[in-house]
Amino acid sequence: MAEFTVPEVDYTRYSNYQLVVIPLIILAVALLIIASWYVLTGSPVTQGIAFTGGTEITVETDGATTTQIVEAFSVEPESVQAVPTANTYIVTFQSNGNSGVAVTDLTRQAEQAGFEVQSAYEVSPSFGATTQTLALGGVGVAFLGMSVLVFLMFRVFVPSIAVVVSAFSDIAISVALMNVLGIELSLGTVAALLMIIGYSVDSDILLNNHVLRRSGDFYESTYRAMRTGVTMTLTSIIAMSVMAAVATAFGIQLLAAIGTVLVFGLIADLMNTYLLNLSLLRWYKFKGVAR
């Protein structure tokens, strides 16, 4: 029977600077991508119709091309995405380009073009704006609540700020990769970002608790925390990778997006927990306390 063992890393070979520089460079690149996206589009991440308002229609065609699908409608779609199911496409119309065309009119135009409409739904811009406020507000409240809880738990600045910075970096990297991979912000991906906050805090608090409150020297405590934390995170990465692959194969875009965001967020969490957070903890234990 196969057995997985987390290898012990010899952190004494690396200075704090060597550990922290890679996560900080990647965080800087992620923030640059987000800032550039905001300058170019007016939003730090591409938003789906759940937040902007619009119409989404799933049609099955008789071998029509993307150009023919676009020409079938009186307004130009925002996107036409092929689904792995044969000759099935998801046609999206953003509210700002919809020009007041109702979902019933778009459905009728699709049927007149000989397409079979499998599903169609519409989100009004006002409802989308309200949903956006609630969803992003929820992320903000979750992050703020996490920060307060961490400071109450440890009551020491450096270990607490290490957890908060690591969680922030996980979110920033995930959002930047959403832009790069063309994943829209939706209620599903907002849920994925909330889960990333949870995973990040879990692994960071596990490390901090072992180092600050358990017996044993720094490196022994670190390895004990890594055995649990790395195993937990790798298991989640494998599970989310399988979910994303299966969802992609069956054309379930929402689950594919959630799985992809979680996979990259958890990979970022491994880096930030055991490089960024650990380097700050080691500085605190060996230099900060001495001061």
Curated annotation (Swiss-Prot):
The keyword Transmembrane applies. The chain crosses the membrane at residues 19-39, 134-154, 156-176, 187-209, 226-246, 256-278. Its main location: membrane. SUPFAM superfamilies: Multidrug efflux transporter AcrB transmembrane domain. One of its GO terms (cellular component) is plasma membrane. Pfam families: SecD_SecF_C (PF02355). Keywords: Cell membrane, Membrane, Protein transport, Translocation, Transmembrane, Transmembrane helix, Transport. It is a multi-pass membrane protein. InterPro entries: SecD/SecF_arch_bac, SecD/SecF_export, SecD_SecF_C, SecF_arc. Gene3D superfamilies: Multidrug efflux transporter AcrB transmembrane domain. It is found in: Cell membrane. GO terms for biological process: intracellular protein transmembrane transport; protein targeting. Belongs to the SecD/SecF family. SecF subfamily. Involved in protein export. Part of the protein translocation apparatus. Forms a complex with SecD. This is Protein-export membrane protein SecF. It comes from Haloquadratum walsbyi (strain DSM 16790 / HBSQ001). The lineage of its organism: Archaea, Methanobacteriati, Methanobacteriota, Stenosarchaea group, Halobacteria.
